Amino acid sequence: MANSWDQLGEIASVAQLTGIDALKLIGMIVNAANTARMHKKNCRQFAHHLKLIRNLLEQIKNSEMNQRSEILEPLQGLDDALRRSYILVKSCQEKSYLYLLAMGWNIVNQFEKAQNEIDLFLKIVPLINMADNARIRERLEAIERDQREYTLDEEDRKVQDVILKQESTREAATSVLKKTLSRSYPNMGFCEALKTEEEKLQLELQRSRARYDADQCEVIQRLIDVTQTAATVEPNLEKVLTKKEELTSSKKRDDLYDTDSSSIRADSRSTSYVSSGHELLSGRSLQHRGNWHADLLDCCSEPCLCLKTLFFPCGTLAKISTVATSRQISSTEVCKNLIVYSLILSCCCYTCCIRKKLRKTLNITGGCIDDFLSHLMCCCCALVQELREVEIHRASYGTEKSNKEMSPPTPQFMEE
């Protein structure tokens, strides 16, 4: 991947800034930093450092040193560095959000190199270092002390992990994109923002191909695939929500019909809805609310999954926790939690709490005692059951459940 920080801007763009002096360039950089959409903190830190340099340049401009050729020639190199710096800061406003996110640490390095290059030009100007003017030396010392630390925000780092990891689900990537793009494009809808991002990414892909940068082309192509996938997932999610609403209303009509035809079924269903998961229900009521599709003692039906869970339970529990808590949880984080809970001899309590959250997420009835006993009896069997349940819901939640609940009423005939 390209490391030269001046590749972020086109040579033509830098040439357009020729003729603008250092003071005006610094003012343009400060204005661009205030409107940056990405790396806001880095842009503002960089702009603050340049304000100190502007104070020094204004002091030099008002002194006799400004007329000497030995100081003017090195300052021309400073002008070139400032032009490239302007392109860098401007890119944080205009370039694709996903591109800037993926290139996060690379751009952080560009800010560090830009500041070091600008400071270097000030150090090689001999008359500045030997100046007797107290104010000039004071400003130069302030610049040397102002060592900024550039980094990637924690929130951007988490989004970067979800977007770039191959194992991230389409739904997880789409959910993260919705949240982040709404802030970057407040006046656009989600689909329109995705289209804009894809157009900008296609432009970046052309530039990377022109530089024969294979690694960067691969990253950009991955980002384009993410935008295209999110664009297809969004309409499907709306259709699923609409279908679920239709099934809910249809189910209510069937329940009313069954109430008139059978008092026994009415009592059973009313008990199922009123209890709402606060107590254990009978097996018949569980079918209306949602039961475990995978059996607790059927873990040997998938020996590979069983062995993986036995030797690496953190990986299985991480996948379950991600679904149960609706946020990305790594196996490392799960491992740390298990170690902490093991120290107080309550590891089983931690895993059964995850099982409880999973039941609520998948709308499965049960109780805390059942959860605790399942993990106390065989934690490996319980984890395998939970992961299989997650896979079953992903594959057939919409179709199997609707077909099961949409059974027609019993035919009735009028006696003559």
From Swiss-Prot:
Q: Report the domain of life of the source organism.
A: Eukaryota
Where does this chain mainly localize?
membrane
How does the protein's chain sit in the membrane according to the entry? Answer: Single-pass membrane protein
Q: State the coiled-coil residue ranges.
A: 191-219
Q: What phenotype is described for loss of this gene?
A: No visible phenotype when grown under normal conditions, due to redundancy with MCA1. The roots are able to normally sense the hardness of the growth medium. Mca1 and mca2 double mutant shows a strong growth defect.
Please provide the record's keywords in A-Z order.
Cell membrane, Coiled coil, Membrane, Transmembrane, Transmembrane helix
MF terms from GO for this chain are: calcium channel activity
Its localization reads: Cell membrane
Q: Which GO terms describe its cellular component?
A: plasma membrane
Question: What's any GO biological process attached to this entry?
Answer: post-embryonic root development
For this protein, the activity regulation entry reads:
Inhibited by GdCl(3), but not by verapamil.
**Transmembrane residue ranges:** 338-354
Q: Which InterPro entries match?
A: Adaptor_Cbl_N_dom_sf, MCAfunc, PLAC_motif_containing
Tissue specificity, per the record, is: Expressed in roots, leaves, stems, flowers and siliques. In the root, high levels of expression in vascular tissues, in the stele and endodermis, but no expression in the cortex, epidermis, root cap, promeristem and adjacent elongation zone of the primary root. Not expressed in root hairs. Detected in shoot apical meristem, leaf mesophyll cells and vascular tissues, upper half of inflorescence, but not in petioles of rosette leaves.
What the protein does comes down to: Calcium-permeable stretch-activated channel component. Probably involved in mechanosensing and in mechano-stimulated calcium uptake mechanism.
Per its record, how is this protein called by name?
Answer: Protein MID1-COMPLEMENTING ACTIVITY 2
Instruction: Supply the source organism for this entry.
Output: Arabidopsis thaliana (Mouse-ear cress)
The gene coding this protein: MCA2
